[in-house]
């Protein structure tokens, strides 16, 4: 499909341009030439402070945005296809809420001295481990119920209920927590691509790429599922096996991104629809790579918008993502009604 290939190439160019812009823009604007020299290792005529800003702050943020955006977007695409629900997203199963509960247990019960942006190594690992365990605990429940409930709609409802239970527990923890603990948790809940330092980038990237590769293995089964479960079974697709693999990959990607970046909103829900509108196809052979690229582009764009105030501060990520995501979802709902 020439159109799909062309759009993927365009999205790649846009992603590279936004990646460079992420390295240039911030509280201090750094010339593109100096950024290139820093990345190439030619730092002889570059300010040491600029080198530190690019290598220790902006580069990991940009890489995190690419990986997180691609991961959440693919999760949304797989869930929307598998459940034939245009409003399905990574948070629909309560995975984000499970991760949030894990972080709340660390931040609120252990004195509230931790924050995602600035912690000791042990504290940072504790936050990440708690988020990951919480998210995967929810996934274990979803796996269990998927063996009992065959209806896609009922499984979605169960996921929503699990999310409500987790959010209720978080509210109780906030009620009994200290002011410092509540503030610390709120900062994490705002979402940020700045929570992954270069020290942890290898771990984050390895797990995320592993999940993305796993999602690519589902392209053919997802195309079959578009025609209905019965048709897919006639083609030899093991529906239960595909569903379990899909839930595992979705859980892994959502857990790792939420643990490192907080509960990032709307990217998983809106980006698959943006990709569909661009390609005007449901063929996952082209749609899935385009969704990954589109997710990375949207995440990089949001990160640039977050730093636009410059020296005045950084806008919370979850204050920006709805600006892009909400209009897309409203358009999809109106189109579905027609």
Which ranges hold each PLM region?
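Alpha-helical transmembrane segments in inner-membrane proteins
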Residues: 1-338
């Amino acid at each position: 499909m020439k159109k799909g290939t062309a759009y993927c190439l365009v999205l790649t160019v846009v992603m590279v341009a936004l990646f460079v812009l992420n390295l240039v823009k911030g509280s201090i604007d750094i010339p593109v030439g100096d950024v290139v020299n820093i990345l190439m290792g030619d730092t002889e005529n570059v300010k040491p402070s600029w080198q530190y800003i690019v290598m220790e702050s902006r580069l990991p943020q940009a890489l995190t945005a690419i990986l997180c955006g691609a991961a959440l977007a693919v999760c949304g695409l797989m869930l929307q296809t598998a459940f034939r629900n245009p409003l399905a997203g990574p948070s629909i199963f309560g995975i984000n809420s499970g991760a949030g509960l894990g972080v709340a247990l660390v931040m609120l019960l252990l004195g509230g001295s931790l924050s995602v942006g600035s912690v000791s190594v042990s504290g940072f690992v504790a936050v990440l481990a708690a988020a990951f365990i919480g998210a995967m605990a929810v996934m274990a429940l979803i796996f269990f119920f998927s063996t009992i409930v065959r209806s896609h709609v009922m499984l979605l409802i169960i996921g929503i209920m699990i999310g409500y239970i987790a959010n209720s527990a978080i509210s109780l923890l906030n009620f009994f927590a200290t002011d410092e603990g509540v503030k610390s948790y709120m900062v994490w809940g705002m979402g940020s691509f700045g929570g992954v330092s270069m020290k942890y980038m290898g771990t984050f990237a390895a797990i995320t790429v592993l999940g993305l590769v796993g999602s690519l293995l589902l392209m053919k089964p997802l195309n079959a599922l578009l025609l209905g479960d019965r048709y897919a079974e006639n083609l030899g697709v093991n529906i239960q096996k595909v569903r379990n693999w899909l839930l595992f990959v979705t859980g892994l990607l959502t857990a790792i991104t939420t643990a490192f970046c907080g509960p990032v909103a709307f990217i998983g829900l809106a980006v698959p629809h943006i990709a569909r509108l661009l390609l005007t196809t449901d063929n996952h052979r082209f749609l899935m790579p385009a969704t990954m690229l589109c997710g990375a582009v949207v995440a990089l764009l949001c990160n640039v918008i977050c730093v636009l105030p410059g020296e005045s501060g950084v806008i919370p990520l979850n204050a920006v993502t709805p600006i892009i995501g909400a209009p897309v979802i409203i358009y999809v709902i109106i189109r579905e009604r027609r």
